[in-house]
Amino acid sequence: MTSTPGATPPASSLDPAVAARLKRGADGLVPAIAQQYDTGEVLMLGWMDDEALHRTLTTGRCTYWSRSRQEYWVKGDTSGHVQHVKSVALDCDADTVLVKVDQTGAACHTGDRTCFDADALPLGK
């Protein structure tokens, strides 16, 4: 399903009280960090608009907005690497979403467990 983020969502969309708190970027999106609920492992960063957050909250599966494909995607629908939502929270500025999930398989499209496994940067001395 394709749509434009930030466009007027359907009437059944995100709770207005939650929507009023969100601080979105100019593109209508907020960063969404997926974290393994029981280990604290940071898995990936995706993007959500109001509709993606609504779907995540109501279906129990993470829905993201693909900036490259300009469409919604549910993590695991293609790969089988599903993110089952355990909790969702806003940060103190309400400009980032933390989604605690139970990750099945790899979180990264490369096949790695997380999107942060492959490219650790050296620290200066």
Curated annotation (Swiss-Prot):
Q: Which GO terms describe its cellular component?
A: cytoplasm
Residues that, per the record, bind Mg(2+): 91, 93, 95
Annotated GO biological processes are: L-histidine biosynthetic process
The superkingdom of the source organism is: Bacteria
Catalytic activity reported = 1-(5-phospho-beta-D-ribosyl)-5'-AMP + H2O = 1-(5-phospho-beta-D-ribosyl)-5-[(5-phospho-beta-D-ribosylamino)methylideneamino]imidazole-4-carboxamide
Q: Has UniProt tagged this entry with the keyword Cell division?
A: no
Matching SUPFAM superfamilies: HisI-like
The EC number(s) attached to this protein equal 3.5.4.19
- Sites where the protein binds Zn(2+): 92, 108, 115
Question: Which Pfam families does its entry note?
Answer: PRA-CH
Subunit composition and interactions: Homodimer.
Give the protein's recorded name: Phosphoribosyl-AMP cyclohydrolase
Q: What is the lineage of its organism?
A: Bacteria, Bacillati, Actinomycetota, Actinomycetes, Kitasatosporales
